Amino acid sequence: PPRSTLFPYTTLFRSIDREKLAWIMDLKNNRRGRIKEYADHFDGVEFTASKPEPNLNGLWDTNVDIALPCATQNEINGEEAQMLVDNEVIAVAEGANMPCTPEAVECFHANGVLFAPGKASNAGGVATSGLEMSQNSLRMNWTREEVDQKLEGIMINIHKNAFETAEKYGMPGNYVAGANIAGFLKVAEAMQAQGMV
């Protein structure tokens, strides 16, 4: 599959505040602009053009506290995960479908990096679609704030389930195991309730 090395990226050397976040949201949601415009507009931001280096993306060789791979499947491989570890990353949260290879996930776990798998951390889109279907079937019109409040509750519950399930099954802090086991149990319970098992 294609990798995010095909895409440029920005590195923030100063914190992002509400004003800058609003500017980015307007750029992406309304103006449909490119992130380079953000780097051109604000100080403390470095833009790096795409580099066609297969299987190695310099983005991940950056000193960051949190990494959010959100572009595509297999975005971070084991070598790139090690670059993040070497740069003392604290947490990685997937924002796409399996952007981290199994080797990358293993590297994060082996080095004590908090890792949120996409099936949990990237569930907001699916949850919002479910809320939209509920809203439509009820012939209701929720405000953006109401949808956001409902989504927040769903995401808090997903975190709680993954966290508590990992602890219950002897793997505290392993959100991959917690999310997988919690998901399996939910499906198994539904199958039992339907008399399928």
Region annotations inferred by a language model:
Residues 24-80:
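A structured beta-alpha segment of the ubiquitous adenosine-cofactor-binding alpha/beta core
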Residues 10-26:
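Terminal amphipathic helices with adjacent charged low-complexity linkers/tails
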Residues 3, 69-71, 94-95, 116:
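Generic beta-strand/beta-sheet core signal
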Residues 1, 5-12:
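Short, small-residue-biased leader/transition segments that mark boundaries at the very start
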Residues 83-197:
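Adenosine-phosphate binding glycine-rich loop
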